Amino acid sequence: MASSMISSATVATVSRATPAQATMVAPFTGLKSTAAFPATRKSNNDITSLASNGGRVQCMKVWPPLGLQKFETLSYLPPLSIESLAKQIEYLILKGWIPCLEFELEHPFVYRENNRSPGYYDGRYWVMWKLPMFGCTDATQVLAELQEASKTYPTSHIRIIGFDNKRQVQCISFIAYKPPAK
């Protein structure tokens, strides 16, 4: 019984920070830490000079809100090459996930039709291309199915998902084929 009790003096000394501990953390200003050179810290309080990444970029751009629709993971990147797709597929196979192809003809972007509440499920249901590729061990098998699906439905968007059958969840999803621009 006595071994499970702690005195309040012990708790107070553990939770109290000493002045030496409070000054050990170097300040961080902007995008570059000044911890290595404490004497060179700027004393200028001008708001335009607070954020700096060493002068490499003068202005950061934001995603344009008009004309560019958001699709899935990696949609902010340029279209993936065959080699990049193969690496993504190899990654999901290496993780033990089951590759599966899905396609959508009308609304491949984030679109709410059946439900208006925010969340992971946005009301989109994609059509599965054949069956999930159980036992698939090679990315070229998935790429061959992707090529067949894109020939069958050339105006659709096709995505590859990685499904974890142990946890019963979809772990990865990305657009693998976009139709040519009209």
Swiss-Prot record:
GO molecular function: ribulose-bisphosphate carboxylase activity
Protein function: RuBisCO catalyzes two reactions: the carboxylation of D-ribulose 1,5-bisphosphate, the primary event in carbon dioxide fixation, as well as the oxidative fragmentation of the pentose substrate. Both reactions occur simultaneously and in competition at the same active site. Although the small subunit is not catalytic it is essential for maximal activity.
Classification of source organism: Eukaryota, Viridiplantae, Streptophyta, Embryophyta, Tracheophyta
Identification of the protein by name: Ribulose bisphosphate carboxylase small subunit, chloroplastic
Organism: Fagus crenata
Subunit text: Heterohexadecamer of 8 large and 8 small subunits.
Transit peptide region: 1-58
One protein family per Pfam: RuBisCO_small
Database matches in SUPFAM superfamilies: RuBisCO, small subunit (SSF55239)
